[in-house]
Swiss-Prot record:
UniProt GO molecular function: DNA binding; DNA-binding transcription factor activity; sequence-specific DNA binding
Localization annotation: Nucleus
Entries under Pfam families matching the protein: Forkhead
Expression by tissue: Expressed diffusely through much of gastrula and neurula stage embryos. At stage 23 (late neurula), limited to the otic vesicle. By stage 28 (tailbud), also expressed transiently in the presumptive nephrostomes of the pronephros. At stage 35 (early tadpole), expressed broadly in the head and strongly expressed in the developing gill structures.
One GO BP: regulation of DNA-templated transcription
InterPro entries: FH_FOXJ1 (IPR047512), Fork_head_dom (IPR001766), FOXJ1 (IPR047513), TF_fork_head_CS_1 (IPR018122), TF_fork_head_CS_2 (IPR030456), WH-like_DNA-bd_sf (IPR036388), WH_DNA-bd_sf (IPR036390)
Organism: Xenopus tropicalis (Western clawed frog)
CDD domains tied to this protein: FH_FOXJ1
Protein name: Forkhead box protein J1.2
Stated role: Key transcription factor required for motile ciliogenesis. Activates genes essential for motile cilia formation and function.
Main location: nucleus
Any one annotated GO CC term: nucleus
Cited SMART domains: FH (SM00339)
Origin: domain of life: Eukaryota
Length: 371
């Protein structure tokens, strides 16, 4: 086998021509032989890059396009060559939309849901109600796909008839022969089937989003929280004694709570601009607390007098007006007798009062109350 030696080497010009054809932008082998002093600038200025052939892509560089043999291309020359290459490429023609005959084509599944197929069968029938077998036969006659498909689609038809609210079952009459019941469209949802499409009705906005006022009332921080009613609880100690536990207003933040309107269950928050002065708020809190203590003492005295009389009296809910409690006319005594008798039970010792106050107080005031 012959071996190439230094005497059989190719000429230098031939090697350069071969290397130019094999070089690319990523090959830096030309940099070893390149020199600015030995380069003929006049030949580079007069040379023109060859136009790309039709077989080449618009973005592929021509063969031998390296930095050693010619200057970089300008954008104007490249922009002229690109349209010529794109013009030679064939453009795909838009395929026309072909209509599918579902009566004869068994390979394409109809683009209809099972509920839509049931509605189409009921609309095409002259009768008001159809049996399950009649729905099956209409679908197989009009759609060849279900004629040759697995019969599991019949289970889907039965499930849609049973679970979909658009269909209702009609029992068979005694004079009608045959077995099984009938199926028909519910008149309330008959408008949902329009032009072969079963539309879905949206829920009204009132069911999805309640009024904002109800949300604001429910989440208001100073409104009283609903608790189990304690009006019918009885406390028996010694003899027959009945006491009523009334809902007590909050003595700590009376100015921030919402006033209750008579004859209405809604509460409206007070104006935040009013009562913003802390001195007025403290004075108002002290005055209301004093009045509140006097009302509680009078109510406890009334319950004590009622228990000592030995009669079981059913106390009615007194009308509330301007946060004043009215004593019962029966067993009422003068103020001199009231002052002489000592008050046994204090308002702050009543069961559940401390829990009510701490529950309705804001977090920054609970620490001061506990201390």
């Amino acid at each position: 086998m012959p071996v190439l030696s230094t005497a059989h080497r190719l000429p230098l010009s031939v090697e350069r021509d071969c290397s130019r054809e094999d070089d690319s932008l990523t090959n830096l082998q030309w940099l070893q032989d390149f020199s600015i002093l030995s380069t003929d600038l006049s030949s580079i200025a007069n040379s023109r890059p060859p136009l790309p052939r039709a077989s080449q892509g618009p973005c592929s560089p021509p063969a031998g396009d390296t930095a050693s043999c010619q200057a970089p291309r300008t954008g104007k020359q490249r922009s002229v060559a690109v349209p010529t290459a794109w013009a030679s490429l064939p453009t795909p023609s838009p395929s026309p939309v072909q209509e599918v005959d579902y009566r004869t084509n068994a390979n394409i599944k109809p683009p209809y849901s099972y509920a839509t197929l049931i509605c189409m069968a009921m609309e095409a029938s002259q009768q008001r109600k159809l049996t399950l077998s009649a729905i099956y036969s209409w679908i197989t006659q009009n759609f060849c796909y279900y004629r040759h498909a697995d019969p599991s689609w019949q289970n889907s038809i039965r499930h849609n008839l049973s679970l979909n609210k658009c269909f209702m079952k009609v029992p068979r009459g005694k004079d009608e022969p045959g077995k099984g019941g009938f199926w028909q469209m519910d008149p309330r949802y008959a408008d949902m089937f329009v032009n072969g499409v079963l539309k879905r009705r949206r829920m009204p906005a009132s069911h999805l989003d309640p009024p904002r006022c109800n949300k604001a009332i429910a989440h208001h921080p100073y409104l009283p929280v609903s608790r189990p009613s304690s009006h019918h609880m009885q406390h028996i100690s010694g003899g027959h004694r009945q006491s009523r536990r009334y809902e007590k207003p909050n003595p700590v933040l009376p100015a921030l709570r919402a006033p209750e309107r008579q004859g209405d269950a809604l509460f409206t928050p007070e104006d935040p601009l009013q009562g913003s002065n802390f001195d007025d708020l403290d004075l108002q809190t002290a005055l209301i607390s004093m009045c509140w203590e006097g009302d509680l003492a009078a109510s406890n005295l009334n319950s004590t007098l009622t228990g000592t009389s030995g009669m079981d009296m059913n106390l009615q809910d007194p009308p509330m007006q301007d946060n004043h409690w009215y004593l019962s006319t029966e067993g009422q005594q003068t103020w001199e007798q009231v002052k002489e008798e000592p008050v046994v039970e204090q308002w702050y010792n009543e069961t559940g009062f401390v829990e009510d106050v701490l529950y309705e107080c804001p977090p920054w005031e609970r620490v001061e109350t506990l201390l």
